Amino acid sequence: QPSKVLVVDTETAKESPTLFARSVTRQVFTDEGELSTIIHAKELLQRDPSEAAKALTPDITLYRDGKASWYITSETALLNPDGTTTLINDVKIQQAKEAEENWLLVTPELSFHAERQYAYTEHPVTMTRIGGRLDAVGMEMDLKKETVEFKANVSAVYQMYNPQDQD
């Protein structure tokens, strides 16, 4: 006989996760067996296997030709049963390139499909890089092809770089 019995009422049981894990990593491979995506989360919680799992502080790295090509982070994410990941709150997408070529994209929510390396949002988006800023509402990204299509209310400001300004 057990020395301790845990008594949980039915209302508490409905709210309690059926799955809880710390420091979780998921690797996604192409049909050819090459690494395409690594998704890491500090914690993973799920109440019902048929529902989305909630990931805390997810960190996604996309790979192309064996090298990191994109980084995506947020405060939380929902790993949906259909294979999409919905990143929520302070979503940041950044290219894994040299600093002078790098840009940062920020949005409050983003849907991401790891196998297709495709992302989209209907929310406001801000893209910044040295000397420039672009604001829009909604976008679609094909991360394999490295293309971005902004949907509406697009405005951009770009400051030309002049090497003589550094004197």
Regions found by a protein language model. Name each.
Residues 1-167:
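Mature-chain termini and adjacent capping regions
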